[in-house]
């Protein structure tokens, strides 16, 4: 298992209330929670040695008679790599799968070809795995009829309700309890002493809510999520569920209860329906709004999809974001979902809640990006483009928005070759703030992906995370149907990352200008499915030993010049004093003071020499204390943050610009625009858009300062 794979571990949802009569279980989904899934797994705990011997014996007998793929039930149709259960098998899943293989091999060797075909259609690997999913997908199938008041994992429902209805002091905060390896998680909402469900600042609303609460006796409601996460992932999965789903859904229900008495009315409706329908829970769910909310929430969250809930006539959506965005390559032992996107630009947007950055190490910590105010996601996203993950009309239909709404028009106008800033300029009716809101909305709800605008002048490579071993077989035929006039998928990927030469601009792959749009569409398809990522350029400013020596010599010469100037000024002062003494009338004075002053004047040059030594020593200390990276024995130095360069570092930079490279005023202006980005963290491809610099100007600058930069190209 890995934190990159979705695993909500949700096995049920309970609705518990507390009235003057005590706690009561109102509704639960699935209806039958009496069985313990861990007990069902025990029957598959066979002896490993016996199973291996049987497996090897039967395989040696049948391998020459029957096709191996058919014997194992593995082919391109039933090996559904797109299904989430494909990546979440457990030991019990594997044992069950091996049992299915045994029975399949026996039937293949004993049945006729017609019966064999029927057997293969009946037993599919996808069905086998999906029925034993760790995400409790068995619970999402049509459950048997059962009483809501029945046992919950072998424990009396009334006993569990007593524990799930905490006293008022423990309500309105996170609630977590473990019973028989099952974790009960929720946010119990209790009515305050003044009859309010939440603090209200206006007296009118206060009086209105008092009339609501006077009509019912509901004191507390608690929506409890029952989970069985893996032990090693327990804390992470529980926090994830509470943050994204439980806390938000409970607060929405509290709001509706405060404003419209929603929960109280639904509880009365459910109790009345339970009496009239005589245990027909499926019909109860269809007639109760809150029951449908609980059912839809379970079916959406347990399958790692988006739960679209209609709460009191308002559409609310909840999800646990999946991790398909990576800023660096994960370890080989860390699994991830196919079609994941690998790009350093994810790091710039990782400080928002809209992108859930993937883990690069097993059971590591979530990536936390620290960005300054200038590079915040709110400001920098306007320079990015959106890549829709589905057809525009399908997205509009799935989001249940009107076809002529502003959001629908925005979705239709999205082009992966245009940044959001250009979209705003192209449509005067949409301001940039509204476009950013729409963009974040599409990103969060898995309808679009943030990328740098596609360009034929950019360089693209095959992603190290490309799903070549998982989806390539199916995607080859799909790519050929989608782009019949283009090279095949393997050949297309070979053109992007050839073995004989370095990757070049995408324009070298396009045969002519007439093919440009079609090739860019194919490029967008490859990025969407995780096959391709953009190769970006990052640079550091390098200070050679030669530059440092010259700057140090300049500093020493300046100090010597200052010393000579002081000596000259001192001699002039002494001469002036002597002339004034000869012209002055002779007065009876004490010669002691004169001797002291003469001795001070004679000793002043020596004092200047001693004074210059601490300054030179301080210079060396400043050089040693500069935040730099030494490459080879202190010869060359990389400035880590040229945007906040020290005084000495600025002198190094000026020496490069004006004396070593002798840049023109135009290139000097471009250099200072890019100086703060020469830290190896910002790609030049993004800066071209951000600073409005042409590629020709950038190319001239890089050629001029080529000896003084270190360039690295990666995703």
UniProtKB/Swiss-Prot annotation:
Compositionally biased tracts (Basic and acidic residues): 114-124, 610-621
Keywords in alphabetical order: Meiosis, Signal
Segments for region (Disordered): 104-149, 562-621
Ranges of Polar residues composition bias in the record: 569-582
Presence of keyword DNA-binding: no
Signal peptide feature range: 1-21
Annotated Pfam families: HTH_NPRL3, NPR3
The protein's name in its UniProt record: Nitrogen permease regulator 3
Protein species of origin: Candida albicans (strain SC5314 / ATCC MYA-2876) (Yeast)
């Amino acid at each position: 298992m890995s934190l990159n794979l979705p695993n909500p571990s949700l096995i049920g949802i309970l609705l518990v209330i507390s009235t003057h009569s005590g706690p009561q279980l109102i509704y639960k989904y699935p209806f039958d929670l009496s069985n313990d899934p861990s007990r069902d797994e025990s029957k598959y705990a066979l002896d490993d040695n016996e199973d291996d011997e049987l497996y090897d014996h039967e395989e040696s007998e049948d391998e020459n008679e029957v096709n191996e793929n058919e014997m194992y039930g593995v082919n391109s149709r039933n090996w559904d790599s797109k299904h989430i259960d494909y990546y979440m098998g457990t030991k019990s899943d594997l044992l069950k799968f091996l049992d299915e293989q045994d029975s399949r091999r026996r039937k293949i060797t004993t049945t006729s070809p017609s019966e064999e075909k029927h057997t293969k259609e009946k037993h599919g690997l996808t069905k086998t795995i999906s029925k034993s999913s760790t995400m409790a997908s068995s619970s999402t199938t049509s459950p048997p009829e059962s009483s809501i008041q029945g046992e919950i994992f072998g424990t009396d429902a009334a006993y569990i309700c007593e524990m799930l209805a905490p006293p008022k002091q423990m309500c309105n905060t996170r609630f977590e309890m473990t019973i028989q390896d099952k974790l009960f998680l929720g946010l119990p909402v209790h009515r305050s002493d003044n009859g309010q469900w939440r603090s209200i600042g206006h007296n009118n609303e206060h009086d209105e809510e008092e009339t609501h609460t006077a009509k019912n006796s509901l004191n507390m409601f608690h929506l409890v999520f029952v989970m069985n996460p893996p032990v090693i992932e327990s804390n992470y999965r529980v926090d994830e569920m509470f943050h994204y789903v439980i806390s938000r859904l409970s607060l929405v229900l509290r709001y509706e209860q405060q404003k419209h008495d929603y929960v109280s009315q639904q509880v009365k409706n459910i109790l009345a329906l339970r009496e009239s329908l005589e245990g027909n829970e499926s019909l109860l769910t269809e007639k109760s709004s809150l029951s449908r909310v609980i059912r839809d929430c379970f079916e959406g969250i347990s399958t790692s999809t988006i739960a679209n809930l209609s709460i009191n006539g308002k559409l609310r959506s909840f999800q646990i974001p999946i991790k398909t965005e990576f800023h660096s390559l994960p370890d080989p032992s860390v699994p991830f979902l196919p079609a994941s996107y690998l790009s350093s630009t994810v790091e710039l947007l990782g400080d928002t809640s809209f992108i859930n950055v993937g883990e690069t190490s097993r059971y590591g910590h979530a990536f936390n990006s620290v960005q300054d105010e200038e590079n915040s996601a709110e400001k920098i996203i306007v320079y990015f483009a959106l890549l829709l993950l589905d057809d525009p009309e399908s997205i509009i239909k799935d989001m249940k928005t009107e076809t002529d709404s502003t959001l629908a028009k925005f979705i239709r106008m999205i082009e992966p070759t245009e940044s959001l800033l250009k979209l705003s300029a192209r449509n005067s009716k949409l301001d940039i703030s509204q476009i950013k809101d729409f963009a974040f909305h599409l990103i969060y709800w898995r309808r679009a992906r943030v990328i740098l605008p596609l360009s034929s002048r950019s360089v693209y490579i095959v992603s190290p995370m490309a799903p070549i071993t998982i989806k390539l077989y199916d995607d080859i035929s799909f790519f050929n149907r989608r782009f019949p006039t283009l090279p095949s998928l393997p050949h297309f990927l070979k053109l992007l990352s050839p073995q004989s030469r370095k990757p070049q601009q995408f324009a070298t792959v396009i045969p002519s200008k007439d093919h440009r749009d079609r090739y860019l569409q194919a490029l967008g398809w490859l990025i969407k499915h995780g096959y391709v990522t953009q190769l970006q350029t990052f640079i550091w400013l390098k200070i050679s030993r030669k530059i440092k020596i010259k700057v140090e010599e300049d500093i020493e010469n300046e100090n010597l010049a200052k010393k000579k100037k002081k000596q000259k000024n001192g001699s002039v002062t002494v001469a002036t004093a002597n002339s004034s003494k000869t012209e002055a009338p002779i007065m009876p004075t004490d010669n002691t003071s004169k001797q002291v002053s003469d001795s001070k004047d004679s000793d002043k040059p020596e004092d200047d020499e001693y004074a210059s030594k601490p300054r030179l020593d301080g210079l060396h200390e400043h050089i040693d204390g500069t935040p730099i990276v030494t490459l080879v024995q202190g010869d060359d130095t990389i400035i880590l943050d040229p945007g906040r360069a020290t005084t000495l570092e600025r002198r190094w930079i000026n020496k490069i610009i004006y004396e070593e490279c002798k840049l023109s005023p135009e290139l000097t202006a471009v250099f200072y625009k890019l100086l703060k980005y020469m830290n190896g963290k910002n790609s030049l491809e993004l800066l071209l858009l951000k600073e409005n610099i042409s590629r020709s100007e950038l190319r001239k600058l890089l050629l001029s300062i080529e000896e003084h930069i270190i360039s690295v190209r990666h995703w």
